[in-house]
Amino acid sequence: MSDNSQKKVIVGMSGGVDSSVSAYLLQQQGYQVAGLFMKNWEEDDDEEYCSAATDLADAQSVCDKLGIELHTVNFAAEYWDNVFEHFLAEYRAGRTPNPDILCNKEIKFKAFLEFAAEDLNADYIATGHYVRRRDINGKSQLLRGLDNNKDQSYFLYTLSHQQIAQSLFPVGELEKPEVRRIAEKIGLVTAKKKDSTGICFIGERKFRDFLGRYLPAKPGPIMTVDGESLGEHQGLMYHTLGQRKGLGIGGTKEGSEEPWYVIDKDVQNNILIVAQGHEHPRLMSTGLIAQQLYWVDRQTLTEKIHCVVKTRYRQQDIPCSVTPISEDKIEVHFANPVAAVTPGQSAVFYQGEVCLGGGVIEQRLQE
């Protein structure tokens, strides 16, 4: 085993079980470990949302238990400027962004990485992400996490091999139940804490209410493909392609009991377009165009490749071909049609366990 005792690692402590166990595992591996709690959101109002205070207390408790220092830093300005403003702009444009991807790109693996290296003299940062790193020929690769159910490489595809080389992912080698077992065994307060599902750093808010604070909702018609009006939506931003729940329209058309699905948004005219059945042709795509590309090895794609893609988190791998249109634009064709390919979300590419990178879906391609 290489001597890690001279190497300093700063663990991004979220107050959750994954980062807690990451800190412990790194300690076991002999590193000099300290924690860092990032405050990335200022408006921590009323009791329902006071999760940040609880998270900080939990992170502190874990660090005390492990006998390591916990630093805190406020990245709220960076988060607002580089993540949240973009998030709102995408919703305004009728797209459905993924703030976690942007947050990893701008905060956890940029602001945090720089702060740890420059202010805390760290050799590495570490996070509780379920991904793995492999170094080949002097370049770091991003691999899927060992626990297929928890793999988070989809959210980290913008990282470069240099950023990965400066990062450690201890729980990526484990399955989630094992992580909880370790936390319980060593008596960490976070052992039974449930996984967070809120928007990145904003916590478990009621999403519709939260979005409504920053973007005025514009109600408009819900229409079928044939132009028949079925009711009113409260704002296109509250709906995403393939959505079934929360449309407020029931049941039958010409005797069909099939549920209604969002199959398109007409942003220009503020119309939500719906159809019955989740395999409606308008919901299916044969491919997509993506831009804002990030390849982990930072090499530009110059020729067609065959690989697999995910167009959303936890989706089954989809075999596809990827053809470069320009340096920052690709055309992707799926082996079989895929439902609910959503502009604003990311398409992330893999060969085997290796995450190649990805880009933001600009448009879906249909027959």
Swiss-Prot record:
Statement: the UniProt record of this protein carries the keyword Nucleotide-binding: yes
Stretch list, region Interaction with target base in tRNA: 98-100
Active-site residues annotated for this sequence: 103 (nucleophile), 200 (cysteine persulfide intermediate)
Compartments it resides in: Cytoplasm
A GO MF label: ATP binding
InterPro entries found in the cross-reference section: MnmA-like, MnmA-like_C, MnmA-like_central, MnmA-like_central_sf, Rossmann-like_a/b/a_fold
GO biological process: tRNA wobble position uridine thiolation
Disulfide bonds: 103-200
Site (described: Interaction with tRNA): 129, 345
EC primary class: transferase
Region Interaction with tRNA, residue ranges: 150-152, 312-313
GO CC list: cytoplasm
Binding site for ATP: 12-19, 38, 128
Keywords: ATP-binding, Cytoplasm, Disulfide bond, Nucleotide-binding, RNA-binding, Transferase, tRNA processing, tRNA-binding
Main location: cytoplasm
The reaction(s) this protein catalyses: S-sulfanyl-L-cysteinyl-[protein] + uridine(34) in tRNA + AH2 + ATP = 2-thiouridine(34) in tRNA + L-cysteinyl-[protein] + A + AMP + diphosphate + H(+)
Subunit-level organization: Interacts with TusE.
Similarity field: Belongs to the MnmA/TRMU family.
HAMAP family on file: tRNA_thiouridyl_MnmA (MF_00144)
UniProt xrefs under NCBIfam families: PRK00143.1, trmU
Primary role: Catalyzes the 2-thiolation of uridine at the wobble position (U34) of tRNA(Lys), tRNA(Glu) and tRNA(Gln), leading to the formation of s(2)U34, the first step of tRNA-mnm(5)s(2)U34 synthesis. Sulfur is provided by IscS, via a sulfur-relay system. Binds ATP and its substrate tRNAs.
Protein name: tRNA-specific 2-thiouridylase MnmA
Gene this protein is translated from: mnmA
